[in-house]
Each structure stands twice: as structure tokens, then as C-alpha cells.
């Protein structure tokens, strides 16, 4: 797998609330990745005190992908029950499977190691202030684009010097 082609972070255009209940999660990969699964759920499903609890998450395949010139853009919409979400990805190529976490990639053997801390991606809170809500009046507005090239004057003598 080409690890340099895989990119995600839990902010900005990669993970954001679509509305008050839905969360968009995007992942960029190379064309060698054939299937992607996301494991997601509430960060506190396994408890809040640490210890030996194991967070598992719900497994779901990401089916929607956009073909860009050099990458694939995988997109899914999640509905976190408590408006917070913890997740990681399972990436499949023709011959191998890797798990993608905040701190890098793990093989199937590495993910099952006793005592390993899994640094999952986390959307701590879907804040209503982060939801884009366009006012209704925008649909009735006429928008103009001013082409600045029309307003460029001839070069003056000072511009040439």
C-alpha cells in the first residue's frame, strides 16, 4: 500500500457536521486502495475510567468514492448518537489490509497486540455553531462577478521602470 497517498484529519474538510445530527467523514487514498471500512461509535462506550475496557465501534463500509486525478476521495455520513464520534479506518488493497489511526498505520497483527493503545480519530463534539446554515434570503439574491481585467489601465511609464 502507498501510505503517502492516505490522508485524514478530524477537522476542516475531512470531518465536519453536515447538520445538527449528521457527521461527514472523508478519507483521501491512492488508487491502490480497493475497499474502505470505518469503525465508529461513542468515545465513552467502553467506559470513562480507562482500565482494560476495549472500545470496538461499529463497522461500516464506505461505498461512496470520487475519482480524482491522483487520488480517491471516500465519503460517508455518520449519525453519532451523542453528537461525538470516535473512529478509525480499515483499508484493503488487492493483497493486504491496514488499519489507519491518528498516529499512523497498523497491520492486523499489530492491532491485536495486548496492551496497545489505539489512537483513534475523534470528533469531540458536533457544535451547532460549526454547522453551516445559509439564510433563506441568499436564494433570492442576484450575484454579480466583477472581472478586474476590464478595469486594468495601460501600463504607465513608472510601471515600466
Where would I find each of the regions flagged by the language model?
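Structural recognition of the beta-strand scaffold that forms the well-ordered cores
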Residues: 143-145
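Single conserved hydrophobic/aromatic residue that forms the stacking wall/gate
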Residues: 151-154, 158-161
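Aromatic-rich carbohydrate-binding modules that target alpha-glucans
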Residues: 31-83, 92-113
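Short loop/turn segments at strand-loop or loop-helix junctions that form parts
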Residues: 40, 147-149
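Non-catalytic, glycine-rich low-complexity segments
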Residues: 1-33, 111-129, 133-134
Amino acid at each position: 500500500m502507498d501510505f503517502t497517498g492516505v490522508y485524514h484529519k478530524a477537522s476542516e474538510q475531512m470531518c465536519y457536521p453536515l447538520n445538527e445530527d449528521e457527521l461527514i467523514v472523508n478519507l483521501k487514498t491512492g488508487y491502490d486502495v480497493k475497499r474502505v471500512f470505518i469503525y465508529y461509535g461513542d468515545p465513552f462506550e467502553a467506559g470513562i475510567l480507562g482500565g482494560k475496557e476495549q472500545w470496538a465501534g461499529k463497522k461500516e463500509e464506505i461505498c461512496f468514492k470520487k475519482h480524482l486525478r491522483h487520488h480517491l476521495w471516500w465519503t460517508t455520513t455518520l449519525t453519532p448518537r451523542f453528537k461525538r464520534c470516535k473512529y478509525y479506518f480499515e483499508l484493503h488493497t488487492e493483497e493486504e489490509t491496514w488499519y489507519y489511526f491518528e498516529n499512523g498505520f497498523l497491520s492486523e497483527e499489530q492491532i491485536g497486540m495486548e496492551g496497545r493503545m489505539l489512537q483513534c480519530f475523534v470528533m469531540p463534539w458536533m457544535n451547532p455553531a460549526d454547522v453551516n446554515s445559509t439564510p433563506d434570503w441568499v436564494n433570492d439574491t442576484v450575484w454579480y462577478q466583477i472581472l478586474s481585467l476590464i478595469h486594468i489601465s495601460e501600463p504607465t511609464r513608472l510601471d515600466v521602470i
